[in-house]
Swiss-Prot record:
Gene name of the encoded protein: vps-28
Name of the protein this chain belongs to: Vacuolar protein sorting-associated protein 28 homolog
Subunit record text: Component of the ESCRT-I complex (endosomal sorting complex required for transport I).
Cellular location(s): Endosome
Protein family (similarity comment): Belongs to the VPS28 family.
Highest taxon above the source species: Eukaryota
The entry's keywords: Endosome, Protein transport, Transport
Amino acid sequence: MSSQNANLMREVRLFENHSEREQMENLSELFAVLNALEHLEKMFSRDHVSADEYKSECFKLIDQYKVTMRLVHGATSIEDFAKKYRLHCPAAIERIREGRPITVKDDQGNVLKHIASIVEQFITFLDALRLNTRAVDDLYPGLDDLYNAINTTSRVPIDAIVTTKVKKWHDRLSSMAASDEISDEDARQMIFDVESAYQAFNKALNELKH
């Protein structure tokens, strides 16, 4: 075999180390989940699956998305991911934004439950910061849950300041390595920003009651 042919037969490496391999696997998993969710939406719209089957599978895929998205380093939003990897999945993105199957109504009970969840996530994340949690892999999951909760409902009043301040730190942490730690100065500013967002959220809720 000639050297030229040998070079052609040589394995093409998609990663250089274990960390890059995990990132590649996580990206592939996220791509597969979104693709599956898009196909599920189309199948349900064409009556190829029952409502119960659709609901069960949709919840499962949304949960898989949440877990996988946390593991993908540097992914700031599902829209950016789909655009970067040329994945056309508008139905899947809409389902992820709403955080529920289309058959599950966003009734008052769900709204109140969602509000309570956001409040709890605000408090939990602020408590972690005040208890001197500084590692990115400890802080990011809680902040990601909060960020996604804020962005997956249309009926909870979200002031612009809430989204802006939370997104600022979500983007910052998602660009850092899991082993990194934020400085005490950054932690102080993060507490101030997230606390401000929390107060703005509560203010919007109070105005809604009146």
